[in-house]
From Swiss-Prot:
Group of enzyme by EC: hydrolase
Species this protein is from: Xenopus laevis
Family: Belongs to the DEAD box helicase family. DDX6/DHH1 subfamily.
Disordered: annotated span: 1-41
Gene: ddx6
Function statement: ATP-dependent RNA helicase that is an integral component of messenger ribonucleoprotein complexes (mRNPs), storage particles that mask maternal mRNAs from the translational apparatus during oocyte maturation.
Subcellular location: Cytoplasm, P-body; Cytoplasm; Nucleus
Name the record gives this protein: ATP-dependent RNA helicase ddx6
GO cellular component: cytoplasm; cytoplasmic stress granule; nucleus; P-body; ribonucleoprotein complex
Motif Q motif: chain residues: 95-123
SUPFAM superfamilies, per the entry: P-loop containing nucleoside triphosphate hydrolases
Catalytic activity field: ATP + H2O = ADP + phosphate + H(+)
Entry-linked InterPro entries: DEAD/DEAH_box_helicase_dom, Helicase_ATP-bd, Helicase_C-like, P-loop_NTPase, RNA-helicase_DEAD-box_CS, RNA_helicase_DEAD_Q_motif
Tissue distribution of the protein: In adults, expression is restricted to the germline cells of the ovary.
Length: 481
């Protein structure tokens, strides 16, 4: 059965006959992402965006801090996140962001993001990156990797120079938008730090026009930035730092040659930072060729997030939708992401979910870019509880309201499984991963358990809400009634 090319993002089945529609959600802005709705709408009008700097300058001028003032009193802090956190993010050395001698304007942006103290990956990365040394960092999904490289990147900018000084390469368009939003928010008090996102699927001419103005930081997908470099539009001869986020994907066969071509255009004394949850042989080869005495960070004693509880349910293919309906009726879902193995199955499942009476978005790579942007933006802002998607949505995407991930189709690769379930349990919070397993999936299930050194348990008749529902926990450890 074929499915036509998707022309519009679909909000499916906005009925309220089930318990899932309880008004708009407001995901908290945590260390992996977030941002104001206005910023996100502006970002998503075009996939390639640049902050003007004028707003940031105005903010800085309106809240000038004189020496000796208690500058922290002027900060507009978000509500404190009282959800329980696991040792993935709490097992730190006790450092403070102020220990790294960062610019006060940068510290203001950090604290206003709600980042109170550095996570383990940030503690390890920030001082080394500030020293100018290359880094090979391995850390779990959702533990603060974006902050680990954006903070030193912004600290090292010289805003007096009218040139691109840093570049962040990511594998997907949605991740590029997310990282650029974080970068703009963290740098908003720096008075003129200009950040541009550029991705494929958007108007190249718009990017060329934006690069005529001052740009300090470029956040891009590989193909688009290489195109701009080859056209002589993106001048990269003054770049001092390049970051490869999700390095294992960027150095896979899909992107390897493009990444090699990009690296060859950069100055020889540039700093390279590699971040990923997994490091296959391709990453090791790249490190040997291009990194100079890299500082290696490995915070991966175990691969899966401590806060994610994993279950499986044995079903036939025909029972999957019925099983999903049962899960929807019994689980207390804040937001869920449901993975399928093909674009066609994504659309078919989204239609089925809407027929069951549940609200549902879907997203996959065959959709037009502006529609992907809108779905990403609206789901992140809590306009819908459930998102059906392909593996397009597994890389780095940080939506902290997601507490349940369902593998409607079980993946074949351990790496894919790891990235999928990492969409819940972000930044040390709790989450649930449920896998629908057919007879043909049973060998993959066993293999993935062995490769990841994890246990995927049979699903019980009733799942304890303390395992995945945020409001059942507080920092004091007391359960709410």
């Amino acid at each position: 059965m074929s499915t036509a090319r998707t022309e519009n993002p679909v909000l499916m089945g906005m009925s309220s006959q089930n318990g899932q529609l309880r008004g708009p959600l407001k995901p908290s802005a945590g260390p992996g992402g977030g941002g104001t709705q206005t910023q996100q709408i502006n970002q998503l009008k075009n996939a390639s965006t640049i902050n003007s700097g004028s707003q940031q300058q105005a903010q800085s001028m309106s809240s000038i801090i004189k020496p000796g003032d208690d500058w922290k009193k002027t900060l507009k802090l978000p509500p404190k996140d009282l959800r329980i956190k696991t040792s993935d993010v709490t097992s730190t050395k006790g450092n403070e962001f102020e220990d790294y001698c960062l610019k006060r304007e940068l510290l203001m942006g950090i604290f206003e993001m709600g980042w109170e103290k550095p996570s383990p990956i940030q503690e390890e990365s920030i001082p080394i990156a500030l020293s100018g040394r290359d880094i090979l960092a391995r850390a779990k999904n959702g533990t603060g990797k974006s902050g680990a490289y954006l903070i030193p990147l912004l600290e090292r900018l010289d805003l007096k120079k009218d040139c691109i000084q840093a570049m962040v390469i990511v594998p997907t368009r949605e991740l590029a938008l997310q990282v650029s939003q974080i970068c703009i928010q963290v740098s908003k008090h720096m008075g003129g730090a200009k950040v541009m996102a550029t991705t494929g699927g958007t108007n190249l001419r718009d990017d060329i026009m934006r690069l005529d103005d001052t740009v300090h930081v470029v956040i891009a997908t590989p193909g688009r930035i290489l195109d701009l470099i080859k056209k002589g539009v993106a001048k990269v001869d003054h770049i001092q730092m390049i970051v490869l986020d999700e390095a294992d994907k960027l150095l896979s066969q899909d992107f390897m040659q493009i990444m090699e071509d990009i690296i060859m255009t950069l100055p020889k004394n540039r700093q390279i930072l590699l971040y990923s949850a997994t490091f296959p042989l391709s990453v090791q080869k790249f490190m040997t060729l291009h990194l100079q005495k890299p500082y290696e960070i490995n915070l991966m004693e175990e691969l899966t997030l401590k806060g994610v509880t994993q279950y499986y349910a044995y079903v036939t293919e025909r029972q999957k939708v019925h099983c999903l309906n049962t899960l929807f009726s019994r689980l207390q879902i804040n937001q869920s992401i449901i993975f399928c193995n093909s674009s066609q199955r994504v659309e078919l499942l989204a239609k089925k979910i809407s027929q069951l009476g549940y609200s549902c978005f879907y997203i996959h790579a065959k959709m037009r870019q502006e529609h992907r942007n809108r779905v990403f933006h609206d789901f992140r802002n809590g306009l819908c509880r459930n998102l059906v998607c392909t593996d397009l949505f597994t890389r780095g995407i940080d939506i902290q309201a997601v507490n349940v991930v369902i593998n409607f189709d079980f993946p074949k690769l351990a790496e894919t499984y790891l990235h999928r379930i990492g969409r819940s349990g972000r930044f040390g919070h709790l989450g649930l991963a449920i896998n629908l397993i057919t007879y043909d999936d049973r060998f993959n299930l066993k293999s993935i358990e062995e490769q990841l050194g994890t246990e995927i348990k049979p699903i019980p008749s009733s799942i304890d809400k303390n395992l995945y529902v945020a409001e059942y926990h507080s920092e004091s450890g007391e359960d709410k009634p």
